[in-house]
Amino acid sequence: MKHQLELVKVSRETLEGTREIYQKNEKDIERYLDLLLEWNEKINLVSRSVSRETLREHVVHSLIPMQLGLLEAFNSWIDSGSGGGLPGAPLAIANPAKRFFLNDNVKKKMRAVDDIIQQAGIENSETVAKSISLVDLQKGTGIVTKHAFKIDDLLRLLGSKPWKTIIMWKGVEGAAEEIRTFNKKLNTTLYEFHFGDDEPFYEGKGLLVIQR
């Protein structure tokens, strides 16, 4: 199956711009991280071995689509497989005029995240504790998901839902292989990070945008 795949190299300037977004929202993001780490001692929302510094990098990673202008098409987004609220919570903090639904089928995680977003005052977000296959996805809602699904699994769960854009945080090689072996034609753009040798966190990573 031949797929329409556009490759886009993302330069270091994009990372620098994303870090500026982080800095503008640092107070609220740090409050979110405080609560995430507090809850993580009770429920495994993120790896217990992860440092706060690495979590901050995960937040920056979550904000990259904003710097690339990929969120502008929709005012409503659902973060599926959200876990502890990544990428949805940071995106909600940095985009107060947009609505974010944090979705995961693990109910105890969503109870924790619901408490986090309430205590953090992230008023433009809410949790949805069910499989994405059971969500009543409204037209005009984009989908984001960070290292939670393979392409075929997510599209199978979405079924006939009226999605238009999906943004997936993926390893570049893995994403290209998933696209190559998928048995239906996809319109995809793969954003490959080229941030330099001194940014090892981002090595081999990228964003896959699927549109229809």
Tell what function each PLM region has.
Residues 60-139:
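Conserved SAM/SAH cofactor-binding pocket of Class I
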Residues 173-212:
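Active-site capping/gating segments
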Residues 147-151, 172-174:
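Short beta->alpha connector loops
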Residues 150-160:
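A short, conserved alpha-helix within the catalytic core of class I
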Residues 36, 170, 210:
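Residue-level signal for inorganic ion chemistry
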Residues 140-147:
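Short SAM/SAH-binding signature in class I
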Residues 163-176:
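Conserved beta-strand signature within the Rossmann-like core of class I S-adenosyl-L-methionine
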Residues 2-72, 108-123:
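Class I SAM-dependent transferase core
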